[in-house]
Structure formats: C-alpha cells, structure tokens
Design a protein with these regions (language model features):
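SAM-dependent Rossmann-like transferase core, predominantly class I methyltransferases
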Residues: 82-142
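Conserved beta-strand segments that form the floor/walls of ligand-binding pockets within enzyme
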Residues: 12, 99, 114-116, 172, ...
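Conserved SAM/SAH cofactor-binding pocket of Class I
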Residues: 119-200, 204
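N-terminal auxiliary segments of SAM/dcSAM-dependent transferases
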Residues: 7-108
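S-adenosylmethionine
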Residues: 173-276
Length: 276
C-alpha cells in the first residue's frame, strides 16, 4: 500500500546552460545548499543541470540562468528518479577523525555525524560546509552558546553540539528546515542542546559566543550588522558560502571585526572574525 504522506513525484530544477558556464553555475547551485547536481552534456554544446532546489530560491535560479545565457524550468519526475543521487552518496571528511555521513551510508571509523538532507538541503559534502565546520570547531568550546544562521538541515549545529557539547540555536527561512534540524538533532542524540528559533528580534544584542553562517555572499553582507549585534564582545563570527574573490567585500561589511582565520577550498572561502 502506498503511504499517502509520501509524495509520488518531486518537482526539480532543470537548467540548460552553455558548456563553458556549467561549472560556475553548478557551483552556485551547490552554494544554495542542494543535495546533488546532475550534469548531462547535450549535443548542441550545452549542459543540462538538474537539482532539487528549494522554491525560496526560484528568483535566484532564474537570474542565474539569465546571467549565464541559460534557461531554467521546473519538471516533475517520479521520486525514484529524483532520489537516484542517494545511491552515490558518500561520507565526507571534515578534519582529523571527524566525518559527515548520510544517514543511509555505512560510517567510516572515527567520530561521525549522521545527516538526512530532506532532499532540498546538502549532505555536508560541499566545500562551504566543510570549511565552516572545520573553522567553527577551532573556536567553539563546551559551554558556548552558538547560533547557526541559515542552518539548512542543521548539520553545522548538530555537529558542533555533538563534538563539543555546546548549545546551539538554528534558524533558516526554508519551510522544511525545522523538521530537518529536529530530525538530525535526534539522529545524533543532541535534541537537548540543538533548538530551533524563529529568527532574530529587531534590536537583539550580544547573546552568542559564536555565530556561524554558511550563506551566499550577498546575504552575508545584508545581515552583517544583525549577526555582529548578537555576538558577544570578544566573540566569534564564522562565515562561509562565499567565493575566494568575495572575501574582501564580505569582510568589509563586518565593520570593526578582525579577521583571525581564512580558509580556502576549490575557490570557496571561509572567514573567522572576532567582534571587538
């Protein structure tokens, strides 16, 4: 019998772009937090990219296609087709003995964080997630309070709490995020320390030892003042989701903060900032 709660089909993005633009467009899709990007070369010199993108990013995707001479459309496919990426999922090494592991994949030896991406979030295998987590692990300590802004599946908050004992709060505008956060927190035994919050209150000040945000660069700039405001004096802001050539612009938006660490991976970057 078919479970009525389980959809029979997914609506996924299909984006056709010139072959020369495929890599940068694919990187941009990964930056939106997708779980996978399928690339299919076409005979006319173009490439079709397919991904399960949150409807919240529809305008971003249309603009991305326009900017690179491509066309975006949404197609409906059976769940069995949309989920084929799961068969190719692998554990992702973060640092030391720490691994991020999809819930259905055999875990390697070491400290593992299990992740269920809920089909619209990443599995933790994108460089921006690895950069953010490795940088945050260097500054987060037991007893700290941490905000994961733009949390997606909650992988950063869950991992930080499980590995350090810190208390985390999570927020994301995606409607599926809360369920994903609560599922992954329970999956890793940290439901008592990882909590959902509805957003930042206007005028909110200085509540967190560490703020982590793995979001695209324009958004990091837009919310800079709010993130700094909720960080305790002497606290830390860890930023990821930006390209290497965007670091100066993003850092400049965090007025008065000093850069204490910068990491690079495949053209992506993270910044660790100290609030005065």
């Amino acid at each position: 019998m078919t479970d009525p709660a389980v959809p029979a089909a997914w609506t996924i993005l299909e984006l056709e772009v010139p072959a020369g633009s495929a890599e940068i467009v694919s990187d941009a899709l990964w930056g939106l937090g997708v779980a996978a990007v399928e690339e299919t070369p076409m005979s006319g010199g173009s490439v079709v990219l397919r991904a399960n993108v949150s409807p919240l990013h529809d305008e971003t995707v249309v603009e991305l296609a326009r900017r690179h001479g491509g066309v975006a459309k949404w197609v409906t496919v059976p769940v069995s087709v949309a989920d084929t990426w799961r068969a190719h999922a692998r554990a992702t090494h973060v640092a030391g003995d720490v691994w991020l592991v999809p819930e259905w994949v055999e875990a390697p030896e070491g400290r593992t964080i299990r992740v269920e991406p809920f089909d619209v979030f990443g599995m933790g295998n994108h460089p921006t997630t690895v950069l953010a987590l490795s940088a945050a692990l260097d500054v987060v300590r037991d007893g700290h309070t941490v905000l994961d802004m733009g949390c997606g599946s909650g992988v950063l908050a869950v991992a930080l709490s499980a590995l350090t004992g810190c208390a985390c709060e999570c927020h994301d505008i995606a409607p599926q995020a809360r369920d994903a956060v609560e599922h992954n927190a329970a999956l890793n035994g940290v439901s008592d320390r990882v909590k959902w919050r509805e957003g930042l209150d206007p005028g909110e000040r200085a509540g967190y030892d560490v703020v982590v945000a793995n979001i695209l660069a324009p958004v990091l700039c837009e919310i800079a003042d709010a993130l700094v405001a909720v960080t305790k004096p002497g606290g830390t802001v860890v930023l990821s989701g930006l390209r290497e050539d965007q670091t100066e612009r993003v850092a400049a938006a965090y007025t008065g903060c000093d850069i204490t660490d910068q990491r690079l991976d495949g053209g992506w970057a993270s910044l660790t900032l100290c609030r005065p």
